[in-house]
Amino acid sequence: MVKVVKNFVKVNQYTRPGLKLAGVKGIVMHYTATPGASALNERDYFNGTCIAIKRKASSAHYFVDRKEAQHIIPENEVAYHAHDKNRCYVSFLKPNANTKSISVEMCVEKDGMIHSETVQNAAELVADLCKRYGLSTNKIVRHYDVTNKICPAPWVSDSSQLTTFRKKVDSLLGNKTVSKTTSSTSQSSKSTGTILKKGASGSQVKALQKRLIAAGFSLPKYGADGSYENETVQAVKALQKKAGIAVDGIYGPATEKALAAIGAKKKKPSSNGKKTSYPLPSGIYKVKSPLMKGTGVRQIQEALAALYFYPDKGAKNNGIDGYYGPKTANAVKRFQLMHGLSADGIYGSDTKAKLKTLLK
């Protein structure tokens, strides 16, 4: 078990407000994004500079490095870690993840990467938390899942790292895990006898969600987020009702057969659930006064949304409104970060080219 050092920061309005949690419903994983800083360095920052100079509402319960875990906020208190812009896209943490979760920050090395020893220490800590609070590993989520912030960045650019981490925690807990990875997500895939139901998560759930959307069973709030929660249950029930089969919200062979039949009748969507084409404007689009607006902006927003970079996920039409405001710029910036482009939130030729490549 990783060495845990209890080293609470002082109660203050910015990093430790002293508010009580409403319960522990999940674990939110983060990374520090401060190359070379140790867990103790982070603890001292949130007990000093962040309060006296930055005056920024930010913190986490635990900071983990290759050596130890610094426990800086009591587990029964709120840490300010995952409520950016009042967002919460994880149903079991709504309406505010800060009040229902414990946060774990992984320190990064000088090269900006998370060391395997740090990941192992984090897994040991999280396994202990899951055991004590009766949490299954599908309650371990990324900051990105909660608010769409690119954190932990290595786990956003490669989502399989979260799956691997969950399996590691399952192993530490002595649980047997079943792989949920499939070799194909096309509409024409054959039934494998897979059963998916509420609480499941991963790439196979995300593939199912994409197929549901393509077949006309919308997921307006969360889209294809890889979590089999109430919205997906209702979409599956709607499919089952339409197909005249047992309505239980559980995806199995009969539901797969029904979905494949409906998908085969769909002529307009492609096999991955996207529109056949996304026209994109030329030129430069950025935030300016007055805001840029019109068809070109809407085309950019629709293309980003097709790749799950929503201007304002959960809002009306997921923020696709034809105005190039801060939220659209943020969606562009997130897209650029994920695909190795200069992350300035400005749409130009490079961003257009990358969008076109991914939407082919």
From Swiss-Prot:
GO CC annotation terms, alphabetical: extracellular region
Record keywords, A-Z: Cell wall biogenesis/degradation, Hydrolase, Repeat, Secreted, Signal
Protein location: Secreted
EC number: 3.5.1.28
Signal peptide start and end residues: 1-39
Sequence repeats (start-end): 166-191, 196-259, 265-289, 291-355
Stretches for region 2 X approximate repeats: 166-289, 196-355
Gene3D superfamilies in the record: Peptidoglycan recognition protein-like (3.40.80.10), PGBD-like superfamily/PGBD (1.10.101.10)
Main location per the UniProt record: secreted
Keyword Cell wall biogenesis/degradation in record: yes
Keyword Glycosyltransferase listed: no
Cited InterPro entries: Amidase/PGRP_sf (IPR036505), Amidase_domain (IPR002502), NAMLAA_amidase_2 (IPR051206), Peptidoglycan-bd-like (IPR002477), PGBD-like_sf (IPR036365), PGBDSf (IPR036366)
Pfam families recorded: Amidase_2, PG_binding_1
A GO BP annotation: peptidoglycan turnover
Catalyzed chemical reaction(s): Hydrolyzes the link between N-acetylmuramoyl residues and L-amino acid residues in certain cell-wall glycopeptides
Alphabetized GO MF terms: N-acetylmuramoyl-L-alanine amidase activity
Protein name: N-acetylmuramoyl-L-alanine amidase CwlL
Record organism: Bacillus licheniformis
